[in-house]
Amino acid sequence: MSKTNKNQKSITSFFKNPGQTSTNDSSASKPKSSPIVETKEIKKENEEEILKMPSSSPPPGPAPAPIPSAQLILSPKKPTVAVCPTIQRQPTSETEWINLSDRFLLTNRNFEVQYAHLYAERLGSLRKIVTKAAENRWDRKIPIKRMNDIIPDEECILVGILFKQMILKPSIVKQIATENGFSLQPPRNRYVDPTDKLILEEETQRIELNGKIDVDQFVTGIVMAIRGYEDEKGVFIVKDYCFKDLSIPKQLSPMKDDQYILLASGFLLSETSIIFNQLEYLVNSLTQSSNIQSKQIQNILSNIIRFVVAGNLIESSNRLKETTNQAKYLTRKMTASSVEAMHSIDELFNKIAAITDIDIMPGVNDPSCHMLPQQPLHPCMFPSSSKQKSTHCLTNPYDFQIGDIRLLGTSGQNVDDIDLQSTIDNRVHILENCLNWGVIAPTCPDTLSCYPYVKNDPFIINDTPHVFFAGNQPKFETRLFKGPNNIEVRLICIPCFAQSNSCVALNLNTLECHEISFENQTPQIIQ
């Protein structure tokens, strides 16, 4: 063995065990009769040996680099990681994200109070605003009265909260009757009946409404002002009505470039799902948008700066099945199907979170309390994707801002519940009504479960959004609502992905939106 090889062996051994040297290395550099050398002398000797080592580099040119073996051990190189080209998707000052959903977070949970406090708080919060709207709409000579001050046949204005009396509405009494063997009601798509009545309530008393008001177009929980008179039967004959005035949203200025957010809902994954291919097409279209032939779709998908999932990640039947088989999962080493579904969703979100921000809202089927406002899903349900800062678990409803654009949305429970109790023609019209009524979910807590708030009502819409959406709807619908004072609000019904295989792309510059189908490998815009 040459001297160089001996020296290299000594160097390698030294850097593997700093401050020590092997017996063979010591004998190679000193006589056997030499005493044991101190550590400092060994370090000095090895440094001299490194300097004396012959260089394999040619004489001319810059000084030779340190030997590879020593350099590798001293400063090991970290493995390189492939990074997706996401520079164009990074939010700018024009698209900075602000979460405004703090009012939906439950910090102190107390379920020992009555739900009447929520209605009283809603009426108390909106009374002055609705009264002002009534004064602006009608002649100020018409008196605004409390119900106990009404004089029969004298025209006046009343302000109160609406209650819809429905004979077919589900109730706990009917549930108990069903459990005791009484006949069930036939399945219904709606609980509307010709005998339904509208009743206006306030702190003093209540009064039945009739006249120019369509019972089937209203639901419980709406604060409104009505103009009319009381007849000889004690029924208030309505001549006109109004709601709170919409606040004027911030004026939007044009952006330099078009930026988009992608809205999706209703994956409904389970062990029998058949949409895994479509979800894979969705991920591939987002991560490899440069391969898309359509320039229009390529421009949209390459400029997605946010992906919002409006609930219902898993199928509802899984939860029912697991409830009956709970003992089996506790006693045997078996995995619930919903766990496998959540694992698949986590892998999906992990890929998307690598290229853009993703906002996850819970839905009625998801592992979160069904009562509104639903709290954020726990990050432990997404062990991979939750490690990325671009993954955000949020509430339902979800209120947020991107740049100057205010967006407000739900996972669809509010729209579904209103559809059950009215004959409103389409879902986007329900969204428009909620906007005019000034309440996200007016039927909370009558027929839609919610937390029993006492001192505030978080469902009141104090600030008019620029975009108002609802997830898990039967089909894609959109409308540009135009109100007084040049107010414009984009209303969006997001289709259920498991049924439509499509998402909605919203242009933040123009507030226009497109339904994009991912039914096959080539995404298409549905006209």
Could you tell me what each predicted segment is?
Residues 2-527:
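Extended recognition/assembly regions associated with phosphoester-bond processing machinery
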